[in-house]
Amino acid sequence: MKSDAIKKGPGKAAQRSLLKALGLTNEEISRPIIGIVSSQNEIIPGHMNLDKITEAVRKGILMSGGTPLAIPTIGVCDGIAMGQEGMKYSLVTRELIADSIECMAKAHAFDALVLIPNCDKIVPGMVMGALRVNVPSVVISGGPMLAGKYKGKDISLTTMFEAVGSYENGTMDEKELCDLEECACPTCGSCSGMFTANSMNCLCEVLGIALPGNGTIPAVFSERIRLAKRAGMAVMDMLKNDIKPRDIINEKSIMNALKADMALGCSTNSVLHITAIANEAKVNMNLDIINDLSSKTPDLCKLAPASNVHIENLYAAGGITAMMNELSKKDILDLDCITVTGKTQGENIKGVTVKDYEVIRPIDNPYSKNGGIAILRGNLAPDGAVVKRAAVLPEMLVHEGPAIVFNSEEEANEAIFNKKINPGDVIVIRYEGPKGGPGMREMLQATAAIAGMGLDDSVALITDGRFSGATRGASIGHVSPEAASGGMIGLIEDGDIISIDINNAKLEVKLSYEEIQRRKLKFKPIEPKVKEGYLARYAKLVSSASEGAILK
């Protein structure tokens, strides 16, 4: 056992004395020591229930003969941090979480890990940490929130952000805004649509690092507790059979995850995180593969924010295994990949059927023959940009308009709320990339305001920052290279004509070669926005969004 390094033989008597200070008996010390990595806290609705998940995992480990020891890690609520300086600290926690797992697991020689995240960056951060440590590991999330109810309709966090735009536009009064606020987020759990948290929790199933059901069983269902117990039992089986994260997450399972991403219409952040996970798994991933996979993978699901269908509906329709089974009818997935069950994906999905073909479309009658995510390239984004095609209105798939340029999210939000944006405009928000932000903030407040004001059918937004999974509309992010690295987005001026052609994967600014060269000669990036602390260090080390915004 790996834990023998801290407990076996006379030379480890001092270490055993410290383990006994924890209250452990000799018998407990002799068993495999399993680290339970929990990001439970009282500021994230999706993490407030993780203490219950931890206790269930603990019971599963004990039932299977292990000794569980819980350790903490951090987590940021993107929804609460949104629209202010605090959002710069969201993406950057992904690396801190991976680093902390590496430090704690290796320092204490854990034999195996059970990872308990739920929201946004915490999920990929834990997967990245597990790949570094590479001991048997299972991800078990806290589960999705139920959708809210208002006047007979399902609502979510997207509803709230867009309601602010409607209020500012004068189409909603304060009473209705407050009424919505009371019921939009009715339970604990990750926000109820196919936003970033649920995207990553679902894709963990497809990667094989989580048990079937991980992505869709609601947080408040007792089935979630039973799944957590099974996760504790599963990690003990993995330890017995020596199944490790790098056995599970490899090129084939990464391709499966990207294909599922297309079929589900996941958050654009999933591209960033899968790229980073691939890096930890030593898999070389080029963004160009995404358009290739998208052309071969139909969009089977249209979930919030692209519709009013939520994760609880996907759960009732059969969940991720049912969606995978539908894709398998056209041999789209590699079903020989091993998973945390000890079985292959093919064995996991055998016999699972779709229960609602309105939520998970038949493979022969998809919402779209192309997947939900697209990579755009052109002189404005030579290294790529990302758009959630599934959430773009048909009339905005091709668009040309004058640029209106901002050097921060705050400047853009002020202009939007002061009604300085006209139909046809292309909002450009720059110096919000991984290095320039720093931290690559999400522009949800801006995109939600555009939608709430009824401009999502005529206004596009491009940025070197990111978007929340709750964003909808012609919102193009991750523009690379970013402005702070001398990217073309830093050269755009008000009035330049921006050409967007999502159907043909193009993003261009209509300038002559000579004009572009003239601007490059006089270009000078703005002063760094943050000059001390963790963000300043992060800005010096972070790579481009096209590389997953990993630290180098």
From Swiss-Prot:
Its cofactor is [2Fe-2S] cluster; Mg(2+). GO terms for cellular component: cytosol. Signal peptide: none annotated. It holds the Pfam family ILVD_EDD_N. The active site is at residue 468. Mg(2+) binds at residues 78, 120-121, 442. The modification N6-carboxylysine is found at residue 121. Gene3D superfamilies: IlvD/EDD C-terminal domain-like. Pathway: Amino-acid biosynthesis; L-isoleucine biosynthesis; L-isoleucine from 2-oxobutanoate: step 3/4; Amino-acid biosynthesis; L-valine biosynthesis; L-valine from pyruvate: step 3/4. SUPFAM superfamilies: IlvD/EDD N-terminal domain-like, LeuD/IlvD-like. [2Fe-2S] cluster binds at residues 119, 191. Its EC number is 4.2.1.9. PANTHER family: D-XYLONATE DEHYDRATASE, D-XYLONATE DEHYDRATASE YAGF-RELATED. Functions in the biosynthesis of branched-chain amino acids. Catalyzes the dehydration of (2R,3R)-2,3-dihydroxy-3-methylpentanoate (2,3-dihydroxy-3-methylvalerate) into 2-oxo-3-methylpentanoate (2-oxo-3-methylvalerate) and of (2R)-2,3-dihydroxy-3-methylbutanoate (2,3-dihydroxyisovalerate) into 2-oxo-3-methylbutanoate (2-oxoisovalerate), the penultimate precursor to L-isoleucine and L-valine, respectively. Homodimer. This is Dihydroxy-acid dehydratase. It comes from Clostridium botulinum (strain Eklund 17B / Type B).
